[in-house]
Amino acid sequence: KLTWLGDRFRMLNADVLAVQEVWDDAALKGALGRSGLRYDFVAVPGAENDATHGGAQGTPQVGIATRLKVEAMQSFAEFPPGFQVDVPGLGLHTRFERPPLVATLRMKHGQSLTVLTAHLKSKRPKFLQDAQGNPTEDRDDRKVMALASLRSLIMRGAAAMPLRCL
């Protein structure tokens, strides 16, 4: 898999790679290494894998790899004030499931470039579950399925709203 990804990265030969579905920054760095290309900056906030972190927990993260100079980078876990939304059965939705990443880069001829890397919640229904991850709803019930689909739609829309204001 790392070799396959490395081949894709080499074919792109991009100055900036915005990535999603990263569970482990070491794996991304490994794929970049297999590309044979040099990326001076690689970051996947929340998916660090080192002595104190064990990669992403619960959901994959987004990241960036670039050859350009990085002037600023920020990951946003919380929605900005005023963007919280009530989700039926879950309560107030106040956080991004996969925090978006905003990076300000300096291009080779001096222009400033802002890159937003985001991965919104899937359209897959959001069923209620207990603290251990066990379902607390009958997934075969059409009403439950409809409500779970509504939850997903609300959460996806709630995450899309503040992206316009970051």
Explain the meaning of each model-derived region.
Residues 35-41, 66-73:
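A SAM-dependent methyltransferase catalytic signature shared across enzymes that methylate proteins
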Residues 1-38, 43-60, 134-141, 155, ...:
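N-terminal, active-site-proximal structural segment of metallo-dependent hydrolase catalytic domains
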Residues 1-2, 67-166:
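Active-site regions of metal-assisted phosphoester/phosphodiester hydrolases
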Residues 15, 60-63, 101, 113:
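Residue-level detector of short, conserved catalytic/binding motifs and their immediate flanks
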